[in-house]
Regions:
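Intrinsically disordered, low-complexity acidic/Ser/Thr/Pro-rich linker and tail segments
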Residues: 2-121, 140, 152, 294-315, ...
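Loop/turn segments within WD40 beta-propeller blades
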Residues: 84-97, 133-140, 174-183, 211-213, ...
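WD40-repeat beta-propellers
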Residues: 109-113, 151-156, 194-198, 230, ...
Length: 445
């Protein structure tokens, strides 16, 4: 058959439309599933995987309050954030549960079945308070740091930790991630050092002195190629490291890195869809001036050596009449979302206002963003937004508003953390005169 006849043949297009290459490419564009293998797929195809994920996303986006059931659990500590232990976001298993990790007032690490609202595992009571909690859902691992400067790795099944490692300095930030070479943990400490360890064994791989002051921000890029680090001292310049040089350090030579030429960095986020793009939020010491600066990070061969280069591609200042942003997020590489008082604002990276949402009456007091969803909270309500696929208008869709049906009006409280996966929304409500409660919403399927 000639090429012309092949193009006209419906069977030819059907083969293309069902090809694993096409559907895997579409999946990689939308989700961080580079480590998702044919073994994870089992008997399913990449087309089935893609359509299954999109169906789950839309179920949450299209849900209304009556589509949710909620469970309330009391006596949750408020020192650390929540973290999902389950990999519900990327799975072909219809029966997989949403599992969330939290810390009890007795300093136990706890795992909760969100759909059932029940605790399914807890660690022994710890002598020292937890100060940090991260998870690696792909490996079903939780990693904690306590106030004695000890890192522990848990599988949330066995009673005791899989690995324990005392650190020389307090650690302000941790990042767990999975690469083609395996799972790793990156830690930034109060002395300005970045440590890299294997997981779950916590074997030391490298130690890099990045700053003369403590590190408060440590973020891996979506493709795990870059690591952003920022110190506590606002006059120091943030740095971006090549992850490969931290995982495979060369004796006698410093890891590849570059400074981003903007001080006063208050926050930063990588762009899920343009994986080498990062946006910084810079704020003056008075908090009256906020600027967003976007960089593209690349490597270049110069004289036989590889160097990292950061290109500033866009920037803008937030108008003086807007309340100073606290949180920010990004999606397709060309838009920035942030809060200002009761408003959620979506700007282009060049400073053009694209959308303004007014779904809360009072100031937004918490914010969470990932490649699919944006969550905001105010007083005792949660609002759900969803990114439109492909950056189409409307770029961010307002979806669902959950009021405080679980709230005890006799006590003062506020939502201190919120997050979601494709099947659930969880939040911590901190009470002034009591310990926090955990509220777990799940779709009533």
């Amino acid at each position: 058959m000639s090429p012309t006849h092949q193009i006209q043949d419906p069977k030819h297009w059907n083969r293309i439309a069902d090809s694993d290459y096409l559907w895997r490419s579409l999946s990689l564009q939308r989700w961080d599933c580079s480590n998702f293998t044919n073994q994870h797929l089992g008997t399913h195809t990449w087309k089935q995987f893609f359509l299954h994920q999109r169906r789950k996303e839309l179920q949450l986006a299209l849900a209304q309050p009556h589509n949710f059931v909620y469970k309330v659990t009391k006596n949750i500590a408020f020192e650390t954030e929540l973290a999902y232990l389950s990999g519900n976001r990327l799975t072909v298993d219809e029966q997989e549960k949403s599992i969330i990790c939290s810390v009890s007032p007795k300093q136990e690490l706890c795992a909760w079945d969100v759909q059932e609202g029940t605790m399914i595992w807890s660690s022994p009571v710890q002598e020292f308070h937890f100060s940090n909690l991260v998870t690696l859902p792909q490996m079903h691992l939780a990693i904690t740091m306590d106030r004695k400067k000890t890192i522990k790795v848990w599988n949330c099944q066995d009673r005791d930790a899989l690995a324990v490692l005392p650190m020389p300095q307090p650690c302000y930030c941790m990042e767990a991630y999975l690469t083609k070479d395996g799972p790793f943990l990156m830690v930034g400490d109060a002395a300005g050092d970045i440590y890299t360890f294997t997981l779950p064994g916590l074997r030391d791989i490298s130690k890099v002195t990045a700053f003369q002051y403590g590190i408060v921000l440590l973020h891996c890029s979506p493709d795990k190629k870059w690591v952003f680090a920022c110190g506590t001292y606002s006059r120091t310049l943030p740095q971006v490291f090549l992850t490969e040089s931290l995982l495979r350090p060369s004796e006698g030579s410093a890891p590849l890195s570059t400074f981003l030429p903007h001080k006063l960095c208050a926050s930063a986020c990588w762009t899920p869809k343009v994986k080498n793009r990062i946006t910084l939020m810079s704020q003056s010491s008075t908090g009256k001036k906020t600027e967003f600066i976007t960089f593209d990070i690349t490597t270049k061969k110069t004289g036989g050596q590889t160097v990292i280069q950061a290109y500033e591609i866009a920037s803008f200042q937030v108008a003086a009449h807007l309340k100073c942003p606290i949180w920010m997020g990004a999606s397709d590489g060309y838009m920035i979302v942030f809060t200002s008082g009761p408003y959620l604002l979506l700007f282009s990276i060049t400073g053009f206002l694209l959308q303004r949402f007014e779904d809360h009456q009072a100031a937004i007091n918490n914010f969470w963003v990932d490649p699919c969803y944006v969550l905001t909270t105010s007083e005792n309500s949660v609002h759900v937004y969803m990114w439109e696929e492909g950056g189409r208008h409307p770029y961010l869709r307002s979806c669902c508003h959950l009021e405080n049906t679980w709230h005890d009006h006799t006590t003062d409280s506020c939502i201190s953390s919120v997050m979601c996966d494709n099947a659930s929304i969880v939040l911590t409500v901190t009470k002034v005169s009591d310990s926090s409660i955990l509220v777990m919403y799940s779709l009533n399927t």
